[in-house]
Amino acid sequence: MALSKLDNLYRAVILDHSSAPRHAGELKQACVIDMNNPTCGDVIRLTVDFTEDKISDIAFSGHGCTISTASASMMTEAVIGKTKEEALELAAIFSQMVTGHTDSAQERLGDGQFLAGVSKFPQRVKCSTLAWNALKKAIEADGTATVSESH
């Protein structure tokens, strides 16, 4: 069965973010969150710099599957420059989307909306939400802590 042009576009965007992730690396002066997905081996270190209530810079490192890496890249693009509240709203929209609850708000995710198809593969939901959950932990830590945990 041939993929439709739209499916090909989604696949190309996901592969692009996975092979050339945006905001890859680590920030020196930032909140550090280490998380892993023990079911598949994905590991992420998210570093977030908050200036007042906004995400002024963000970066991630680690290793993971295509979905995990692409999602982290897409998340960093979506939340940089956003307030903590806006970032949490985007995380909630993303979580709803990858569990099959879609609405027009997912357009706010930018390229992240291309991961909506993950909802068809429940075993991949944790891969797609790892970076977003790390972001939530960074915001909950009020940008001052180093947190390590499993997802």
Spans of model-derived segments:
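C-terminal binding/interaction regions
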Residues: 1-28, 82-151
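Structured beta-strand/loop patches that form or line metal/cofactor-binding pockets in enzymes
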Residues: 20-62
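Contiguous, function-dense segments enriched for cysteine-driven chemistry
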Residues: 38-49, 66, 106, 140-148
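Secondary-structure capping and boundary motifs in well-ordered enzyme cores
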Residues: 40, 67, 120-124
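Short, thiol/selenol-centered motifs that function as redox-active sites or metal-ligating centers
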Residues: 63-69
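Alpha-helical macromolecular-interaction surfaces
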Residues: 69-70, 89
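Alpha-helical support elements that line or immediately flank enzyme active sites
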Residues: 71-83
